[in-house]
């Protein structure tokens, strides 16, 4: 959803990074949680909860998201799971990197798995 009065985007789980956090992260803005590796936790959440992101070119979707955010004049992002984002210039590149990060090689459709020795597959 989008609140036109506050220019606030509510992306649901689109910017989520699971329930992992350290003491003190709750109640902070994303930019204040300097010990939280946003790229990594976003990548893990996307891989595990939004599995389809591991089998498609996420650049297409992230490009469209960024264009939409610019068209709407988004100033704040309030994800369902995750910290509010108020400094888009600082945080959105980390979000982009997390959403397009390569997933766990065992879970993606990249290279086929190597058969176990003695098993021709």
Language model segments and positions:
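Metallo-beta-lactamase
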Residues: 2-79, 84-87
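C-terminal regulatory/interaction regions
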Residues: 64, 86-121
């Amino acid at each position: 959803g989008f609140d036109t009065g506050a220019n606030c985007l509510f992306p649901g789980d689109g910017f989520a990074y699971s329930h992992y956090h350290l003491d003190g992260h709750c109640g902070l803005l994303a930019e204040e949680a300097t010990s939280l590796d946003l790229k990594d936790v976003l990548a893990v959440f996307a891989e595990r909860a939004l599995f389809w992101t591991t089998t498609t070119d996420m650049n297409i979707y992230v490009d469209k998201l960024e264009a939409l955010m610019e068209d709407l004049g988004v100033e704040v992002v309030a994800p369902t799971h995750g910290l509010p984002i108020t400094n888009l210039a600082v945080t959105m590149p980390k979000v982009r990197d997390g959403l397009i990060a390569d997933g766990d090689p065992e879970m993606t459709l990249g290279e086929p798995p190597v058969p176990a020795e003695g098993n021709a597959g």
